[in-house]
């Protein structure tokens, strides 16, 4: 049996965290903790429901919560998010309703897309969260296009594109990065390098020393950040957004993290990952790292954690009950949102 490594501690004093997060840093950390617990509860329940045949598909974000929560907390309402498979927490932190997201997972009549998208492909117009595509890398060029529109409109918003290590080998990655570099657009490219593109290890993905190094060839600033460290992730995203909002050109951050679950509910990582992978991943569990720091500095105890876990679990179960009590979209909805209303033709319109 492989021994479980001790959790890697977050390397900060309270003063360093305050300098990184600014005023209200305690509230920011506690909010991050609550959201990460909710994400973990959502992942656990949805993976179980998928195995029971109650949800058709699910892609968990376990291990990526620090980046997702940091992005949700560091962005402003005018910013836009172009997600990959695992960024649902970004939408929730930005204000998307948990119940609405769960309706989407079930594809019921209260799903904004009326069941037309597969699970984990939501959109949330009210928080500028654009529907993802299963085609790898498309969000990179889409975010660049939105960045161009923001620049033309003199809009203060910033476009954030989230993609995995595998997407850096896609055509759209090249097109989007190059376009953003040429035109100096307000786009933050967030590469969540969980070290596996389904079964392909990152060392088979590129000969470059890092994925961040690719950004420099497009004339962009590129850097690596520990994606299991919520303080580092928040600081990196907030600083980049601040520069972009001030007129700086696009940037790329490579967040190095560990995928702690199968790629999706259709995957069996035991067939390709080394036997010690999960032990290494657990040593960098972003939730455990944050909880350890909060406990050591008197901001979290067992009772408070239990309350947070219970509330998150109740919220998820309530949303599931609401979704399972909702009927599926009826046949009459098939044409909703497909055809625009048309007025009768007149002589003037011909």
Cite the ranges covered by each PLM segment.
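Glycine-rich ThDP/TPP pyrophosphate-binding loop and its adjacent helix/strand module
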Residues: 128-325
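Generic, low-specificity signal for short hydrophobic/alpha-helical stretches with a mild N-terminal bias
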Residues: 18, 24, 28-31, 53, ...
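A general secondary-structure junction signal
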Residues: 85, 255-257, 338
């Amino acid at each position: 049996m492989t021994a479980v490594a001790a959790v890697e501690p977050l390397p900060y004093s309270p003063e360093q965290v305050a300098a990184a997060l600014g005023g209200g840093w305690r509230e920011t950390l506690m909010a991050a903790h609550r959201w990460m617990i909710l994400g973990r509860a959502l992942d656990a329940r949805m993976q179980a429901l998928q195995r029971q045949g109650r949800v058709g598909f699910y892609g968990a974000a376990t291990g990526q919560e620090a980046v997702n929560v940091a992005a949700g907390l560091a962005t402003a309402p005018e910013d836009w998010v172009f997600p990959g498979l695992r960024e649902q927490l970004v939408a929730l932190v930005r204000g998307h309703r948990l119940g609405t997201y769960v309706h989407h997972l079930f594809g019921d009549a209260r799903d904004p897309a009326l069941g037309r998208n597969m699970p984990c492909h939501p959109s949330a117009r009210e928080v500028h969260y654009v529907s993802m595509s299963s085609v790898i890398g498309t969000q990179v060029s889409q975010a660049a296009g939105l960045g161009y529109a923001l620049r033309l409109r003199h809009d203060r918003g910033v476009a954030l594109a989230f993609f995995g290590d595998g997407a850096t080998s896609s055509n759209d990655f090249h097109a989007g990065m190059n376009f953003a570099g040429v035109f100096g657009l307000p786009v933050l490219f967030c590469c969540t390098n969980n070290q596996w593109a389904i079964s392909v290890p990152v060392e088979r993905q590129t000969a470059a020393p890092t994925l961040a190094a690719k950004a420099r060839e497009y004339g962009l600033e590129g850097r690596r950040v520990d994606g299991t460290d919520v303080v580092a992730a928040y600081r990196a995203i907030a600083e980049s957004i601040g520069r972009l909002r001030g007129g700086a050109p696009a940037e790329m951050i490579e967040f190095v993290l560990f995928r702690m679950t199968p790629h999706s509910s259709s995957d069996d990582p035991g067939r390709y990952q080394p036997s010690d992978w999960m032990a290494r991943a657990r040593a960098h569990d972003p939730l455990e790292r944050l909880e350890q720091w909060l406990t050591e500095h008197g901001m979290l105890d067992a009772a408070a954690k239990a309350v947070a876990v219970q509330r998150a679990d109740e919220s998820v179960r309530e949303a599931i009950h609401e979704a399972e009590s909702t009927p599926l979209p009826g046949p009459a909805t098939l044409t909703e949102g497909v055809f625009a209303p048309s007025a009768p033709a007149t002589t003037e319109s011909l």
